[in-house]
Amino acid sequence: MDSPLRIALIGVGNMGQQHHLHLKTLSEGRLCAVADPASQAAGIAEQWGVPHYPDHRRMLEQVRPDAAIVANPNNLHVATALDCLAAGVPVLLEKPVGVHLDEVRELAAAVKSSGIPVLVGHHRRHNPLIVRARELIQGGALGRLTTVTALWQLHKPDSYFEIPWRREPGAGMLLTNLIHDLDLLRHLCGEVQQVQAITSNAVRGFANEDCAAVLLQFANGALGSLTGSDAVAAPWSWELASGENPVYPQQADQPCYLLAGTGGALSIPQLKRWRYAEGSEGWHQPLLAVEESCAAAEALCLQLRHFVKVARREVEPLVGVADAARTLALLEAIREAAATGRGCAPATIEG
């Protein structure tokens, strides 16, 4: 039996602490060190019983971990991951993979040249609900996918914005939240060829959006829409519908994604599938509905188990750097479309 993987944690903010929570339950890996320059980081490391380093580069040199989780601020993701690769350390890199495509391309090139794996933390792909939904879609249960409706509608309280950077450009719901939904839409429905978008900050007046409407044209011919707002009293979002994170009260009967094709339709996260009976079709005929079964499991924990296998070179990353870069390219196309009022195509990502 393999000994537990020695995993270092770079960044002990909210996501870093969530990773530690799940790492404690993992027999395949254990926390070996913490790196974070914040004043409270040393105390957190002491509570966790591991050494603390203000500088992650010194930690990599002295501790020589088997793998590292990078969960520091977004603008440091690429530089920190590059330092890990230079030290020969596999990385679980929190989303977003980076802030700008140019730096992410640099990271993708470093992964290719070094052969050191990087798993990007779009953890919802690991959720059994999404695994089953993708199986149904790719297995032809919906026929030819035709339309996709995605909703992200909830209310962030005023206290959320007491942290100043959350009111600044680039820190709005597109990069912070909707990037998850865009990644799942790519994962479930395929690549997006073109987008149109409108964003608004009319509710709060901050320097970032509180409402967005996006039209998506998929490469397979399907058309989709994503409507989002973090300033509304509504139950339609992955956070509220899926029950994935217990800090949010679950609205289990409400969907956040509605996918329809020539042979059926699917609501997510309920996994409720609609179709006509054999030999009947058309709007005068009743639709049959069945809820697909799916074993519940914690996506972040499943992601960590997958990361251990990635670090040991047993499997390829479910979400590699180039894959995550395509989600970032889609997000950048949406921003450009909203700014210019024109349809925009996501940048091409090699690999």
Regions found by a protein language model. Name each.
Residues 54, 93, 118-120, 149, ...:
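Hydrophobic residues in well-ordered beta-strands that form the structural core
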Residues 19, 37, 48-110:
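Beta-loop-alpha module in the N-terminal Rossmann-like domain of NAD(P)-dependent dehydrogenases
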Residues 205-209, 219-302:
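NAD(P)-dinucleotide binding in Rossmann-like oxidoreductases
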Residues 1-4, 67-70, 268-269, 306-351:
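C-terminal helix-rich "cap/oligomerization" subdomain common to oxidoreductases
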Residues 33, 67, 147:
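Short, Asp-centered acidic motifs that coordinate Mg2+ and/or phosphate
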Residues 117, 124-216, 223, 341:
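Predominantly a Rossmann-like dinucleotide-binding segment in NAD(P)-dependent oxidoreductases
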Residues 1-48:
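N-terminal Rossmann-like dinucleotide-binding module
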